[in-house]
Amino acid sequence: MFARVSTLFAMFFLGLALMVSATPAALKPVARDTIPASQCNTGDLQCCNTVENADSPSAAALLGLLGVVVQGLDVLVGLTCTPITVIGVGSGANCVQQPVCCENNNFNGLINIGCTPVNLGL
């Protein structure tokens, strides 16, 4: 019985990955150059636990579950992000993970799309 359940999960995630890769594109990729935090004009400044390409297994699974389509597999996405405020009093003020600017932050920090790494200079 366990073998059937694990086979079902494996087929589900394989199908999910195939659907994500075969879906038409919707968002444009962002340049990967590191920019100063003061010039974060591509979106909001975020502190993400993980920053990955959209085609990575964990990012592709989340994008598929949320029904999000991205243009190109080289788009950077941030996973489990918190905002960094200009004043430094937000929940992400002490960013020890990856500070990024992200264009699409509509998923309450679960996943942010179109991210560009930044240099906080702290």
From Swiss-Prot:
<comment type="function">
    <text>Aerial growth, conidiation, and dispersal of filamentous fungi in the environment rely upon a capability of their secreting small amphipathic proteins called hydrophobins (HPBs) with low sequence identity. Class I can self-assemble into an outermost layer of rodlet bundles on aerial cell surfaces, conferring cellular hydrophobicity that supports fungal growth, development and dispersal; whereas Class II form highly ordered films at water-air interfaces through intermolecular interactions but contribute nothing to the rodlet structure.</text>
</comment>
<keyword id="KW-0134">Cell wall</keyword>
<comment type="similarity">
    <text>Belongs to the fungal hydrophobin family.</text>
</comment>
<keyword id="KW-1015">Disulfide bond</keyword>
<dbReference type="InterPro" id="IPR001338">
    <property type="entry name" value="Hydrophobin"/>
</dbReference>
<dbReference type="GO" id="GO:0009277">
    <property type="term" value="C:fungal-type cell wall"/>
</dbReference>
<feature type="disulfide bond">
    <location>
        <begin position="48"/>
        <end position="81"/>
    </location>
</feature>
<feature type="disulfide bond">
    <location>
        <begin position="40"/>
        <end position="101"/>
    </location>
</feature>
<comment type="subunit">
    <text>Self-assembles to form functional amyloid fibrils called rodlets. Self-assembly into fibrillar rodlets occurs spontaneously at hydrophobic:hydrophilic interfaces and the rodlets further associate laterally to form amphipathic monolayers.</text>
</comment>
<keyword id="KW-0964">Secreted</keyword>
<feature type="disulfide bond">
    <location>
        <begin position="47"/>
        <end position="95"/>
    </location>
</feature>
<dbReference type="GO" id="GO:0005576">
    <property type="term" value="C:extracellular region"/>
</dbReference>
<feature type="signal peptide">
    <location>
        <begin position="1"/>
        <end position="22"/>
    </location>
</feature>
<protein>
    <recommendedName>
        <fullName>Class I hydrophobin 2</fullName>
    </recommendedName>
</protein>
<feature type="disulfide bond">
    <location>
        <begin position="102"/>
        <end position="115"/>
    </location>
</feature>
<keyword id="KW-0732">Signal</keyword>
<dbReference type="Pfam" id="PF01185">
    <property type="entry name" value="Hydrophobin"/>
</dbReference>
<dbReference type="GO" id="GO:0005199">
    <property type="term" value="F:structural constituent of cell wall"/>
</dbReference>
